[in-house]
């Protein structure tokens, strides 16, 4: 029984802060297509990506998701909404903020679309050099 307890105590749980495929989206720090391109890279590396946002940045996450879906790169796997308590710096009391987490997986055409996009980019660079 003691061995089981030691095993449970030594387990490494994947907490939210440890997820390698999570992108926390802000609507003020980076442009929209930064997140679109970052999500594509994460899907290439991990096969899926989790987009997460609070408050006003939720619209940005939804827009990034729709761009990836409409262009055939991704399929929705899971959408989760919740509220989180965040301390207001000015008043020191907790304020509730809306939170969304959208998990996207690579579409069947993902690799094909990425290869075509890379080919177009290389062609454009070759034309610039000539």
From Swiss-Prot:
One of its GO terms (biological process) is rRNA processing. GO terms for cellular component: endoplasmic reticulum; nucleus. Pfam families: Alba. The modification N-acetylmethionine is found at residue 1. Gene3D superfamilies: Alba-like domain. SUPFAM superfamilies: AlbA-like. GO terms for molecular function: mRNA binding. Keywords: Acetylation. Homotetramer. This is Uncharacterized protein At2g34160.
């Amino acid at each position: 029984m003691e061995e089981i307890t030691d095993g449970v105590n030594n387990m490494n749980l994947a907490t939210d802060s440890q997820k390698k495929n999570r992108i926390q989206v802000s609507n003020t720090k980076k442009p929209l297509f930064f997140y679109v391109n970052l999500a594509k890279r994460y899907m290439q590396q991990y096969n899926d990506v989790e987009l997460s946002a609070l408050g006003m940045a939720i619209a940005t996450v939804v827009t990034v998701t729709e761009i990836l879906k409409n262009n055939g790169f991704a399929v929705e796997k899971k959408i989760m909404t919740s509220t989180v308590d965040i301390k207001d710096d000015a008043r020191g009391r907790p304020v509730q903020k809306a939170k969304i987490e959208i998990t996207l997986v690579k579409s069947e055409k993902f690799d094909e679309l990425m290869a075509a996009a890379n080919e177009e980019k290389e062609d454009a660079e070759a034309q610039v050099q000539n």
